[in-house]
């Protein structure tokens, strides 16, 4: 893997890891991880790697196992290890309607393959259950690499993050999280979750179409709607951002410093880039 970022506080040692959580996101093109000191509520490590071209899940697991962290940091006795991955196979059930014995019935909504395992996360702030599929080989690989990881789909962390940092709890907010080949998009109205989806998106024209479709479907008054962006997007020379400005003249960037404190060594990090990763720390 190609290393894009690797910042680690020198005070992070095996003997201090018990007060820390390890957060890992495995995307379609990148692997990111962070280590959070839960006692001091501050960031201790942040790293990002480009994933190699892979043809199957065994190759992905092998690539992760080859990371130097698998022989060092990932072996530390952390308080909790949380791992998220990108999945289009998910559905939400309100907590008041959810019944454990009906999990397999709920899973029919996501059309799992025969090799999939069904997992469930609670999205506490939205009072919903997130039911999603993970390939059994991938699940077994994660449990082999990491010690008792809690596994999430990307939806859980993103929703927990936007609920925590919602800038207008009595208004309407549209959140868009950009990645190489997809976007996450969510809407909160008076703090209630109105919409969440993950969409394959390969160019600005596709994004423009999705944005207009969401505006129309939710009947959004864009003059009274806050737009918050995160992920791989910039305010200059970014075609996606220019499309946003056509409809929302004053978008704002999410701020991961509202999730966890960033000591001085992390001050050069663009706060919105790792918003979804750091929001994993808000998950149960």
What does each model-identified segment do?
Residues 26-28, 83-88, 179, 229-234:
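Structural motif
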């Amino acid at each position: 893997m190609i290393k894009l970022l690797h910042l680690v506080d020198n005070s992070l040692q095996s003997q201090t890891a018990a007060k820390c959580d390890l957060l890992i996101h495995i995307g379609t093109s990148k692997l990111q991880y962070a280590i959070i000191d839960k006692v001091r509520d501050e960031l201790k490590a942040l790293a990002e790697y480009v994933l190699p071209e892979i043809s199957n899940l065994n190759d992905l697991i092998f690539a992760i196992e080859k990371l130097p962290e698998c022989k060092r940091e990932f072996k530390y006795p952390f308080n909790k290890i949380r791992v998220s991955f990108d999945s289009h196979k998910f559905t939400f059930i309100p907590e008041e309607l959810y019944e454990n014995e009906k999990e397999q019935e709920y899973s029919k909504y996501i059309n799992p393959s025969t090799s999939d395992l069904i997992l469930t996360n609670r999205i506490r702030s939205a009072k919903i259950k997130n039911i999603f599929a993970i390939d059994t080989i991938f699940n077994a690989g994660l449990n082999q690499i990491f010690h008792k990881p809690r596994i999430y789909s990307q939806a859980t962390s993103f929703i927990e993050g936007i609920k925590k940092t919602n800038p207008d709890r009595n208004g309407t907010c549209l959140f868009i999280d950009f990645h190489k080949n997809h976007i996450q998009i969510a809407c909160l109205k008076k703090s209630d979750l109105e919409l969440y989806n993950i969409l394959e998106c390969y160019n600005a024209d596709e994004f423009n179409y999705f944005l207009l479709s969401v505006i129309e479907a939710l009947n959004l008054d864009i003059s009274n709607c806050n737009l918050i962006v995160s992920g791989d997007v910039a305010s200059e020379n970014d075609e996606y951002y220019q499309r946003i400005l056509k409809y929302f003249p004053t978008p704002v960037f999410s701020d991961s410093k509202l999730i966890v404190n960033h000591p001085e060594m992390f001050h050069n990090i663009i706060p919105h880039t790792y918003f979804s990763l750091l929001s994993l720390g808000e998950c149960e």
